[in-house]
Amino acid sequence: MSSTDTTTEAPRDERRDAEMARITDALGAAVLDSLVKANDDMWIRVSADAWRTTGETLKSLGYSYFCFLSGIDWLPSPFGKGEEDPTEPTPERDSTIKQGYTGGATRFQVIARVMQPFTSLGVNIKVDIDDSMAIDSWCSVYAGANWHERETHEMFGIGFNGHPDLRNMYLPSDFEGFPLRKDFPLLARIVKPWPGIVDVEPLPGDDEQEGEAS
């Protein structure tokens, strides 16, 4: 390396680094992966069997403010972005699942965020959802998780063990499918063939006139 070469060090965030160390020490083996984005945010991924105790531990560490909980479907959409020309053959799409920050091993995950109200520090918690498509409820830990879990169950089909009432909030009880899954077909995703194609429908009587002309 010459004297003119410089190395760029990754930015450090001592405050969040110290807080992440405190969190991972408290959670122990439950933490599968963690990430601190300097001057931005913190992420952890925990084992499914420690999901509820993770919430309890974080609350005891001062993360008493529940922000949100939802599901993630990492499957690349088989419909693409709905921007292709419908008259052209369907292009080949990459079906590789990439789970984002702190990784993962499953198509579906649950993500939640909690904060310390007096320090502005927050942490995002992810957990893999296996084929049982269920995880323990956080309702007994954070009351605000109630309707977030209901919505996640309704839109992704992820169950929450111990939840007092997982009835649908938006959809009819007999609705089939889960609208926020990537493989759920939404007609609104399909680009209408305009202005490249003009779809002309025959007017009433056109068929008769064509028959007379022949």
Model-derived features: positions:
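Terminal low-complexity/charged segments
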Residues: M1-S214
